[in-house]
């Protein structure tokens, strides 16, 4: 369930960091830090370096995000 004020971007995982955190390079060229959403953790969705992902961000902090979907 996403909020109406959240912003969605697509990007690719460029680096894996500790504690299910990833460095994601967005389509517009920016790099952010993103963590896995709870639903993806619950369903044991694995994310590896190079995967295409959909990231949800708030307009308040554009340096952090939440990975909500891994592209097939």
Swiss-Prot record:
Residues 1-72 form the S1-like domain. InterPro entries: NA-bd_OB-fold (IPR012340), RNA-binding_domain_S1_IF1 (IPR006196), S1_domain (IPR003029), TIF_IF1 (IPR004368). The keyword RNA-binding applies. GO terms for cellular component: cytosol. Its main location: cytoplasm. Signal peptide: none annotated. GO terms for molecular function: ribosome binding; rRNA binding; translation initiation factor activity. Keywords: Cytoplasm, Initiation factor, Protein biosynthesis, RNA-binding, rRNA-binding. One of the essential components for the initiation of protein synthesis. Stabilizes the binding of IF-2 and IF-3 on the 30S subunit to which N-formylmethionyl-tRNA(fMet) subsequently binds. Helps modulate mRNA selection, yielding the 30S pre-initiation complex (PIC). Upon addition of the 50S ribosomal subunit IF-1, IF-2 and IF-3 are released leaving the mature 70S translation initiation complex. PANTHER family: TRANSLATION INITIATION FACTOR IF-1, CHLOROPLASTIC. Belongs to the IF-1 family. Component of the 30S ribosomal translation pre-initiation complex which assembles on the 30S ribosome in the order IF-2 and IF-3, IF-1 and N-formylmethionyl-tRNA(fMet); mRNA recruitment can occur at any time during PIC assembly. NCBIfam families: infA. This is Translation initiation factor IF-1. It comes from Xanthomonas campestris pv. campestris (strain B100). The lineage of its organism: Bacteria, Pseudomonadati, Pseudomonadota, Gammaproteobacteria, Lysobacterales.
